[in-house]
C-alpha cells in the first residue's frame, strides 16, 4: 500500500519539524526558566516614612 506509506511519511515529517521548531524556540529563550528577571521588573521600592502628627 504505497498511499499508506506516503501518508505515514507526511505525518512523521510534520511531527519531526514541529518538534525541531519547538526545541529551537525553547532554546532561543534562555530566560524562560529563570524568574529572576520578572521579579526584578516587579520590584517595589520600599522606603520608611516617619509620620509626624501635628
Curated annotation (Swiss-Prot):
Residues spanning the membrane: 9-29
Keyword Nucleus among UniProt keywords: no
Keyword Phosphoprotein: no
Family annotation (InterPro entries): ATP8_metazoa
Biological process terms in GO annotation: proton motive force-driven ATP synthesis
Membrane topology: Single-pass membrane protein
Subunit description: F-type ATPases have 2 components, CF(1) - the catalytic core - and CF(0) - the membrane proton channel.
Protein name in the entry: ATP synthase protein 8
Organism the protein comes from: Arbacia lixula
